[in-house]
Design a protein with these regions (language model features):
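Cross-family detector of peptidyl-prolyl cis-trans isomerase
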Residues: 1-196
């Protein structure tokens, strides 16, 4: 806790002096420490049920660390299955199958987002070898004030116009699962990370 307090004090100083690089490095360090503390408070059992209609999908009922290797350097991601068990499960499943190995970045918006996971060829997602069909992962939304996770519904559908998700897209490097503009249940393999 003392180290975190020092980090927060340093963040204030770097913010005042507009030292962007020191601020980002210190913020990463603080977030790592917070993540370490969070591990002490994780439930021993998975805290809620997943609808049976998704029993055929892989799931992560906890957290995992994944190394992401790119031509520009390596990163480590913490994948949160407590708040998005099906999305996290699909990502871990595909990672363990080396699905993402050597796939290019297929979307890059400067200072905003990078996206990958589009397989080489005509397919736009992961084809399940058992069914020869594209595997789809539903949109998962978890809101701190709610006891359950919502599947295939948007904030607007649910009437939560001003709510913030448990996993907000507010930190450099945050990962997200890609869905098309036309359906909320068609995420398959593509993911993105924010650059701001």
């Amino acid at each position: 806790f003392l180290e975190l307090k020092e980090n927060f004090d340093s963040l204030q100083d770097y913010s005042k002096s507009k030292d962007k690089y020191s601020f980002i490095a210190t913020r990463r360090n603080a977030l790592d420490k917070i993540g370490g503390l969070e591990e002490y408070f994780l439930p021993k059992e998975f805290p809620y049920s997943i609808p049976q209609e998704f029993d055929n999908l892989p799931r992560l009922l906890g957290r995992a660390k994944v190394n992401i290797k790119t031509s520009k350097g390596d990163m480590q991601a913490i994948v949160d299955g407590f708040n998005a068990p099906l999305t996290a499960g699909a990502f871990i499943d595909l990672s363990s199958k080396n699905f993402y190995k050597d796939l290019p970045i297929n979307r890059a918006e400067e200072f905003f987002v990078l996206q990958t996971g589009d397989p080489i060829g005509e397919e736009i997602g992961y084809i399940n070898p058992d069914t020869n069909m594209e595997r789809h992962v539903p949109l998962e939304i978890r809101i701190p004030s709610e006891d359950k996770t919502f599947y295939n519904e948007t904030f607007e559908d649910l009437g939560f116009y001003t709510e913030t998700p448990t996993l907000p897209f507010a930190t450099l490097g945050t990962l997200g699962w890609s869905h098309s503009n036309t359906a909320i249940d068609d995420g398959s393999s593509q993911f993105f990370f924010f650059l701001y």
